């Protein structure tokens, strides 16, 4: 928000240096980015009256005689296309400084002496974006009453001081001059002076020409007035200066009035050419799929159902709260005008402006909020200005639909509540003084008082907001330093935090190093390495395609990290990550995804490098499985590994789903060689587990068990099996035998060869039995082995070797 200090001093009786005001505002809650003086660095710029102007043959130049308030006129050579005799212009005298500290000197152009320079606004340092289009390619023409020889600064308000405010979302009331004036008045305990305009209406009714309706809950209220017989012309210089100092380009008197009201009240407005309407029914509604609108910037916009539009005869004529349409634009031929003042849903406006990358002064205000109480006042003020500046006739009555609350908001608190929070010893008279300065109503006493908060301060709704206002106006620097009165409470980690920390410790104890990868990735990588991919949640305006979708797995990001390291000759890697993946089962454009805590690791290269004693040991499936099993064992969680060929990015013969109670909670295995080739990485093994599922499986209470005094007994068994039988099949068969004294099963040998026959393999297991209350006898162990052997023969067709 750019604030003209000249304008501000018209609204509040203050006379302090602008830099002092800026510092005071920053310390009371509204950050000031800086203070800029447009005239700074400029000198010896005066008003000139062009007495004569002759074309120089065969050139674009003009030889001018210019009165600069001296006894004799000056001869100045000028190349501007809009130079002509009789106009008042900006003259830089010899020795003058213009933009970029450029010094003007006497000189000759085509042999003709030039005693100065006739300047454009660009040459004074003003940006092209705010210069009126009629002067964008030529010199600035000053008002007719400008006096030759006088400084041009007062005529263009270049001697103004522009205070740039950085407005946070909670202080959107300061996006208007009236809001800033209230703030400054409160800081300095002054009164505000706002201009009132008397609106004169004709007997003719606006409702006879237009009708207004709302067909969306995103439009809170919509109000319109009709002004007839306007004369389109440039705005007076004071208004153009004011808009340019606020960073807005002057267009014409009608459009400039709407922008003036936007700056003054903070209420966005729009003006339509009534004669370009194809009907009288104005409807604010959601856009229809496939509708198009050419906006004022000349761009054709494809609309979607989430956009809000203003329609006439069911045709869009404006993007509500963002930008008007070119079809009903105010131009030089416009005579009859419809003025719009409305309140649109901020979220809807923000979505549309973001989707179309179309930001405007109006959209920024609707996004942060507007003052409901000023909608009617702003509309009437604009209509009154059009009678003054455009000679228009205002038709009787506003035409409106919908309503917004305009009454004050009541918030109650107590003096004790305030003093406890601020550590102060304020009395009730101090509170009365603060809210009087803010312009708020106050009733009650120190035990309980109620503040009537005007609608212009919609950021205030609870007791804490009142405390903040008291602290701001009383002065943060006056608040005493005190210790907190409330007793502290002992903190405790949540179950989720404890699990994360334990897994982190276990993973690092297994030799893994933690990384953090991006949660945003490509749509393709988002659903890779996912047993059950869901809908993709994509960003509307991603900075790059590589960071456009929320991940549904962690592994793809880990492989990017491995590829980065391998490319730099770091080949032996053991990495892990604890993070979130995002599952979307509903509409990604409307609903938030479900966040799932996930643990993943990736291994590649050598477990141990070779030396003079031992051979190198590469990472393999069983090593990766052992890492995961060791972590799960410490958590006392039992899972099942089920071979799968369904995951396209994983090796079909070296991949297993991780199941618990019949539910898939993750996977483990080798990255498919073709996928590894795409990443340009060597053989890599990965695992990914749902931490939410692990948390649910944790034992809530651990009960101490005495260490048994009785020894365990082990027996080995070698089985001849079909090569199709898996280790899990063996474990399931042994479990089916129902031997309660069996406490451990360990695979210690696997063999396949010609001696066993085609399609056969041998697997050897060590079985451990123990009775915690007594010694096991040979007969008991033999009985257990017999039951296990029978189960293996029956379930998997095993032969005991």
From Swiss-Prot:
Molecular function terms from GO: ATP binding; catalytic activity, acting on a protein; magnesium ion binding; phenylalanine-tRNA ligase activity; transferase activity; tRNA binding
PROSITE patterns: B5 (PS51483), FDX_ACB (PS51447), TRBD (PS50886)
FDX-ACB domain ranges (all copies): 708-801
Record keyword tRNA-binding present: yes
GO cellular component labels: phenylalanine-tRNA ligase complex
Cofactor: record remark: Binds 2 magnesium ions per tetramer.
Residues given in the record as Mg(2+) binding sites: 459, 465, 468-469
Pfam family, one: B3_4
Residue span, tRNA-binding domain: 39-153
Annotated EC: 6.1.1.20
Top-level class of the enzyme under EC nomenclature: ligase
Coiled coil: none
GO terms (BP aspect): phenylalanyl-tRNA aminoacylation
Chain ranges of the B5 domain: 406-481
CDD domains, per the entry: PheRS_beta_core, tRNA_bind_bactPheRS
Subcellular location per the Swiss-Prot or TrEMBL entry: Cytoplasm
HAMAP family for this protein: Phe_tRNA_synth_beta1
Protein name, entry field: Phenylalanine--tRNA ligase beta subunit
